[in-house]
């Protein structure tokens, strides 16, 4: 079952996101992003970059740091 409301979507650590998950933006919107590829931390400050697509097919990139949380609507 997927969450429909941005406020109700669980906040999880970026390391728990997987390809195929549906995530939200940092601010409250109705935009849903399907993760297509993930760039994980290599060295230095730990960051995760998610390469995703919205429902209109537009590609988007979001970067989250170690202390950030990601809102996940649906798990892959």
Language-model regions, residue ranges each:
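Mixed-charge, Lys/Arg-rich low-complexity intrinsically disordered regions
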Residues: 1-19
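Intrinsically disordered, low-complexity, charged/polar segments
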Residues: 2-7, 51-76
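Basic/aromatic-rich interaction segments and small domains that mediate binding to polyanionic partners
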Residues: 29-64
């Amino acid at each position: 079952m997927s969450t429909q409301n941005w406020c109700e979507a669980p906040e999880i650590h970026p390391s728990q996101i997987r390809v195929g998950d549906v995530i939200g933006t940092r601010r409250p919107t109705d935009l849903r992003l399907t993760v297509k590829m993930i760039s994980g931390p290599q060295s230095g400050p730990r960051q995760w970059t998610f390469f995703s697509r919205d429902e209109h097919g537009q590609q988007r990139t979001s970067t989250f740091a170690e202390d950030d949380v990601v809102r996940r609507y649906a798990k892959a």
